[in-house]
């Protein structure tokens, strides 16, 4: 993905990005998540991408490196997602798969849109094989971007994302019910899944590219919260990993 085109960056901001983040891939949250995901993936694994979308926004190169990569999304365009072996239109809260179908389940910027987290987490546990893992990238509820998002309506989010080069149809309402360490741990533990790790990361200020001043302030914030673990609770993204115990029985579908 062309970062400048994707975010509609001003030339002055582009120059600042090159100055402060010369290795842009290393400072990209999706790239950081994919590196973490790859630590758990084997060539024989069956993977499920929750909220896979069109494959144009959050990219990875897992197809062809695993046994099978399936994606699910309510958007019918998932059927043409080039990153997948198969794209299926379905509600991620009611997955159309048999119990114990996947070795790895993952999601990229999806949890913040889930208004019934208990149903989703139960479904993840149901379709995971014993010993399988679930990895998720989602915004941290304590970050300034998320706090601002909660105070503004969805049309404002669409307008801001349009300025960043993101189509309006790819911006969805956010409810942030799984966007803290505690919320994630509570929901997944209740579903019988074990916490492996929950890390917080702060990356380049992609939401502050509308002016040079805002971008520089964002760089300062990034440097500050990355300077000490004491400020890690205020970093922008959560990367969470949970595992289904080897001895786990099938987790029943949550009643609707």
Residue positions per predicted region:
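A short SAM/SAH-binding and catalytic strip from SAM-dependent methyltransferases
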Residues: 106-115
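Helix-loop segment at the mouth of the active site in Rossmann-fold oxidoreductases
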Residues: 95-97, 114
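Helix-to-beta-strand junctions that scaffold the AdoMet/dcAdoMet cofactor pocket
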Residues: 42, 114-115, 128-130
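Short glycine-centered segments of the SAM/dcSAM-binding site in methyltransferase folds
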Residues: 46, 131-133
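S-adenosyl-L-methionine-dependent methyltransferase catalytic module, highlighting the catalytic core
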Residues: 118-123, 133-248
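Short glycine-/acidic-enriched loop or helix-start segments at secondary-structure transitions
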Residues: 58-60, 81, 116-117, 125, ...
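Conserved N-terminal segment of class I S-adenosyl-L-methionine
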Residues: 1-95, 104-106, 235-238, 246-256
């Amino acid at each position: 993905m062309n970062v400048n085109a994707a975010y509609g960056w001003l030339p002055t901001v582009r120059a600042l990005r090159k100055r402060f983040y010369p290795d842009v891939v290393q400072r990209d949250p999706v790239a950081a998540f994919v590196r973490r995901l790859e630590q758990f993936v084997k060539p024989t694994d069956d993977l499920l991408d929750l909220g896979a979308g069109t494959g144009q926004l959050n990219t990875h190169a897992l197809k062809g490196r695993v046994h099978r990569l399936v994606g699910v999304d309510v958007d019918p365009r998932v059927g043409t997602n080039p990153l997948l072996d198969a794209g299926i239109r379905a509600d991620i809260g009611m997955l159309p798969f048999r119990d114990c179908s996947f070795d790895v389940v993952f999601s990229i910027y999806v949890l913040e849109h889930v208004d019934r987290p208990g149903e989703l987490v139960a479904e993840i546990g149901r379709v995971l094989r014993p010993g399988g893992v679930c990895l998720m990238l989602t915004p941290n509820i304590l970050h300034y971007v998320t706090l601002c998002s909660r105070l503004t309506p969805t049309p404002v989010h669409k307008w801001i994302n349009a300025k960043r080069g993101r189509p309006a149809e790819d911006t969805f309402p956010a409810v942030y019910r799984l966007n803290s360490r505690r919320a994630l741990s509570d929901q997944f533990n209740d579903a019988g899944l074990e916490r492996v790790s929950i890390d917080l990361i702060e990356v380049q200020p992609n939401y502050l590219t509308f002016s040079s001043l805002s971008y520089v302030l964002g760089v300062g914030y990034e440097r500050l919260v990355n300077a000490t673990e004491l400020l890690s609770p205020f970093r922008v993204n959560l990367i969470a990993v949970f595992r289904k115990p080897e001895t786990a029985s099938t987790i029943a579908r949550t009643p609707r």
